[in-house]
Regions:
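Hydrophobic single-pass membrane-targeting/anchoring helices
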Residues: 1-25
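Compositionally biased regions
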Residues: 8, 21-23, 38, 119, ...
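Repeat-blade elements of multi-bladed beta-propeller folds
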Residues: 17-18, 59-69, 94-116, 135-170, ...
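Intrinsically disordered/low-complexity terminal segments and short unstructured peptides
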Residues: 22, 40, 152, 175, ...
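Short stretches within intrinsically disordered, low-complexity N-terminal or propeptide regions
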Residues: 31-32, 36-37, 121, 173, ...
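Short, glycine/acidic-enriched capping/hinge loops at junctions between secondary-structure elements
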Residues: 73-76, 114, 121
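Short loop/turn segments that connect beta-strands within beta-propeller blades
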Residues: 121-124, 173-176, 213-217, 253-256, ...
Length: 419
């Protein structure tokens, strides 16, 4: 789950500074300790010849922010993960965890706000490797399982950085944490990467979207938007979709970076889109939720909340209810919208501003609240509360299909379902 409108939290090692007179996201203060820039990129190399490894069938990978390429934030068939849940192990990172980890082969990969990249055993919570690759970060990594690489974006690699600049994308070995390649991103990036085939896609603070070759960092193409691209891109039908801080949503050909369409919105887009039911769903700092037709960019519907929508949506086809979009707002409410019409199915508030994305596991939609520092789970059909936990501010949960991992302010919890 940088730089929103309001001040949202203070940790011992992390201070988030926000200009309350702007809709720009929060600059995140890093520990003022000098850290080297990522090592230089090695010469290009050919992809390894070995076949793509298959995941263990008992370990469902969660390879990128939003779970799948369309960023639906829906884990299918997760009824066995429904509450009640209890804490197994916990790992305290000591720094802000604004965005959740990714998972593969019993390992969690994540970065904290101070630019430390880590691999953690999902079985017992022990640290496998831990490497400082920058000084300021606010994104989830993404996995290239074929080449056993994990990609991180950085807002800065400069010592003591408190604002974006001199950033990078860094590819590390999933096994050892060693640098495979890196590429400088002068404006910095908080865009959670997306991997498809031999390409990794991401945006930067300067408004450029990149397609890199996964195994050596070669730049396939770049696309220049109308403003900072802070959210991640979503992928569907060989097209990537994203919003920018120039108040536009773009659809770009994933193969060559050519624009397919561009649509105007009411204000800046920090929200990472979700693509489903022929539409692109995302929130805006104007307080609106947009549903645009994926093939044209034409508006299908819009809905207004009471405040900024930095959050990203989750989408699910709910039995007895139909296709539904779940998204939180700074007005403190989680909304469930009819995905076809934008009608409100239900809404609940009271916990404080919602900044991170909702996530659906089984029949429960989870979200965290900035004001109360809590994570809440609600029945996806009725909105009835079925879970509460006293930690969490941004995007709260992921799963490997066996257990749930809950992300607090600076702590990762293994949450075990009742057997």
């Amino acid at each position: 789950m940088a730089g929103p409108l309001l001040a949202i939290g203070v940790a011992v090692v992390v201070l988030i500074l926000v200009n309350s007179g702007s809709t720009d996201r929060r600059p995140v203060a890093a520990v003022p300790v000098a850290a080297p820039s990522p090592p230089p990129t090695p010469p290009p190399r050919k992809p390894p010849p070995e076949p793509r490894p298959k995941p263990d069938p008992t370990d469902d990978p969660w390879p990128l922010y939003g779970y799948d390429l369309a960023r639906t934030r829906l884990f299918p068939g997760g009824a066995k993960l429904d509450p009640p849940l209890h804490v197994g192990w916990r790992f305290n990172d000591g720094a802000l965890l604004e965005f959740p980890p990714v998972i593969y082969d019993n390992t969690l990969y994540f970065e904290d706000a101070n630019g430390w990249a880590s691999a953690l055993s999902s079985t017992d919570g022990h640290l496998i490797w831990h490497r400082r690759i920058g000084t300021l970060a606010a994104a989830s990594p993404a996995l290239d399982i074929r080449h056993k690489l994990v990609f991180f974006t950085l807002l800065s690699t400069s010592p003591g950085a408190r604002v974006p600049g001199n950033g990078a994308v860094v590819a590390l070995s999933m096994r050892t944490g060693q640098v495979a390649w890196s590429h400088p991103l002068a404006p910095g990036s908080e865009s959670s990467p997306l991997v498809h085939g031999l390409s990794v896609f991401l945006g930067d603070q300067g408004g450029t979207v990149y397609s890199f070759r996964t195994y050596d960092g070669h730049v396939n193409w770049t696309f220049h938007g109308n403003g900072s691209v802070k959210g991640g891109v979503a992928f569907a039908h060989n097209t990537i979709y994203f919003g920018d801080y120039g108040a536009r949503v773009h659809a770009v050909d994933a193969a060559n970076g050519r624009e397919i369409w561009s649509a105007a919105g009411g204000d800046s887009f920090y929200s990472t889109p979700a693509v489903a039911y022929g539409r692109v769903y995302l929130g805006s700092t104007s307080g609106a939720v947009y549903a645009l037709w994926a093939n044209s960019g034409a508006t299908s519907w819009t809905a207004s909340t009471g405040a900024y929508v930095y959050a990203s949506p989750a989408v699910a086809d709910v039995p007895g209810l139909g296709p539904t979009v779940y998204i939180g707002s700074y007005d403190g409410h989680l909304y469930a919208y009819d995905a076809d019409t934008g009608g409100v199915r239900w809404s609940h508030g009271g916990g404080g501003r919602i900044d991170g994305s909702a996530t659906v596991l089984g029949s429960v939609v989870y979200y965290s609240s900035l004001g109360s520092n809590t994570t809440t789970g609600r029945n996806w059909r009725t909105g009835q509360q079925v879970f509460s936990f006293p930690d969490g501010e941004f995007t709260p949960v992921i799963t490997d299909g066996k257990v749930v991992f809950l992300i607090g302010y600076s702590t990762i919890y293994q949450m075990l379902p009742k057997r």
